[in-house]
Regions:
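Preference for intrinsically disordered or flexible, low-complexity segments
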Residues: 1-194
């Protein structure tokens, strides 16, 4: 896959965070029926869930759930979209996956092309703010594509999942046309060094 260059911008303002929109590493939640239907491989890890209804002005469906998976050997991503509410859940799948390998998880914000607003997609502690929680949101980071790094004529992909681990970031990319068709089979993954 062609590598895309990014630039990172620190964002100090942490207002208007929607901390319930996503669960990222540490306490993933996955619907039992979905888990059984996917036949996940031993190397394919569930890393995040997004509740579309809890994200302000999402560029993807306004309801339903997005589940992010990544094969840690081939680095091939899989994103599954369903409108079914995960009433029955599995809390501890992929327990051996240790985020500490990548350093401290970092909360990230992202910006979509042509829009001024940013949306929060990652949270290092899904229980942050709840009684007994020891988690902190950390510094937010705005991740932007450097348009100059894209070949002429290539459509700029949208990012709809950015996850930070200390000195690097995992970024999920999707072409705008695929997103409009709700076709999540054409998702790309890149690893970006800070």
């Amino acid at each position: 896959m062609e590598r895309i260059t990014y630039r990172l911008i620190r964002v100090e303002n942490e207002e208007n965070q929607d901390l319930d929109a996503c669960k990222l590493l540490g306490a993933p939640v996955l619907a039992k029926g979905l888990f059984e239907a996917l036949h996940l491989k031993d190397t394919e890890y569930f890393i995040a869930q997004i509740n579309c209804a809890q994200v302000k002005n999402p560029p993807f469906p306004e309801k339903g759930w997005l589940y992010f998976f990544l094969d840690v050997e081939s680095l091939k991503p899989r994103v599954v979209y369903t409108e079914k509410d995960p009433a029955e859940v599995i809390d501890d799948i992929n327990e051996p996956f240790d985020a500490d390998v990548y350093g401290d998880p970092t909360c990230l914000k992202m910006e979509f092309p042509g829009e001024k607003g940013s949306f929060l997609f990652g949270e290092n502690d899904p229980d942050i703010g709840l009684e007994g929680s020891t988690g902190t949101a950390g510094k937010l980071t705005l991740l932007q594509i450097d348009a100059l790094a894209l070949p002429q004529g290539k459509q700029k992909p949208l990012r709809f999942g950015d996850f930070g681990f200390g000195d690097g970031h995992w970024v999920f990319l999707i072409e705008e046309k695929a997103l409009e068709k709700r076709d999540f089979r054409r998702v790309e993954f890149v690893e970006v060094e800070s």
